[in-house]
């Protein structure tokens, strides 16, 4: 785990608070939010979010408000400088990634290209 001074990715209060709420609903304090990148989507890469109980060797863990965000090393290289947030709007509620490395994104924001 690294401290706030050296974090290569921002985990917002809104995202951390939503993770805390969802973990509370599941009644499993071992859960962490994992963000990852996979090939696919209309722009070449897409973001994925899942809850995971384990942290693998090499994973980056960012802690905020008592909850953890976990990123694997392969995904982290595409996310450096980005922000993981949680938004509620007309399109619904969802975790989002604001990625300064993306040269283009699809309309829904779930896929990108570099």
Swiss-Prot record:
Highest taxon, organism lineage: Bacteria
Function noted in UniProt: Required for insertion of 4Fe-4S clusters for at least IspG.
Family to which the UniProt record says this protein belongs: Belongs to the HesB/IscA family.
Keywords of this entry: Iron, Iron-sulfur, Metal-binding
Example of a GO MF term: 4 iron, 4 sulfur cluster binding
Record flagged with keyword Iron: yes
Cofactor(s) the record lists: iron-sulfur cluster
Organism lineage: Bacteria, Pseudomonadati, Pseudomonadota, Gammaproteobacteria, Pasteurellales
Gene designation per UniProt: erpA
One term under GO cellular component: cytosol
Protein name: Iron-sulfur cluster insertion protein ErpA
InterPro entries cross-referenced by the UniProt entry: FeS_biogenesis, FeS_cluster_insertion, FeS_cluster_insertion_CS, FeS_cluster_insertion_RrpA, HesB-like_dom_sf
Pfam family, one: Fe-S_biosyn
Subunit structure, interactors included: Homodimer.
Residue positions binding iron-sulfur cluster: 42, 106, 108
PROSITE patterns tied to this protein: HESB
Cofactor note (record): Binds 1 iron-sulfur cluster per subunit.
Any one of the GO BP annotations: iron-sulfur cluster assembly
Gene3D superfamilies: HesB-like domain
